[in-house]
Amino acid sequence: MMNTKKLIKMFRKWQQRAALHRKRISFQRPSTRSTTVEKGCFVVYTADNTRFAFPISYLSNSVFQEILEISEEEFGLPTGGPITLPFDSVFLEYLIKLIKRRMDGDTEKALLMSISSARCSLQKQEQSTQQLLVF
């Protein structure tokens, strides 16, 4: 039989070796997407799970502020998760092109009105489907 002190010593030795091996194990990420963002940028996801990184300067754009407010109303504030926009990637790419072109005030107002009217029509559709489900 082995001495208790010897068993404890052997156990601690194996624990140390196991700890060393645990530190060396690195798992490969299954996706090739980068989870890091450049300094001065933030990330949003679209409804179809496409990832977009924007410079923080976009936050001063009124159109971008409006779509973030829509996202907040739709999904709530993210708690530990990414910001998700209720639009698909095609619409967001179109929006980026308009912002990069520095659209004039009339175009910006028209875009804001179309976004807000689409939001209102979506809310009406949701209310009507909720009423249908009740009856």
Curated annotation (Swiss-Prot):
Keywords: Auxin signaling pathway, Cell membrane, Developmental protein, Growth regulation, Membrane. Pfam families: Auxin_inducible. Its main location: membrane. This is Auxin-responsive protein SAUR66. It comes from the Eukaryota. It is a peripheral membrane protein. It is found in: Cell membrane. It comes from Arabidopsis thaliana. Belongs to the ARG7 family. GO terms for cellular component: nucleolus; nucleus; plasma membrane. One of its GO terms (biological process) is auxin-activated signaling pathway. May promote auxin-stimulated organ elongation, such as hypocotyls, stamen filaments and petals.
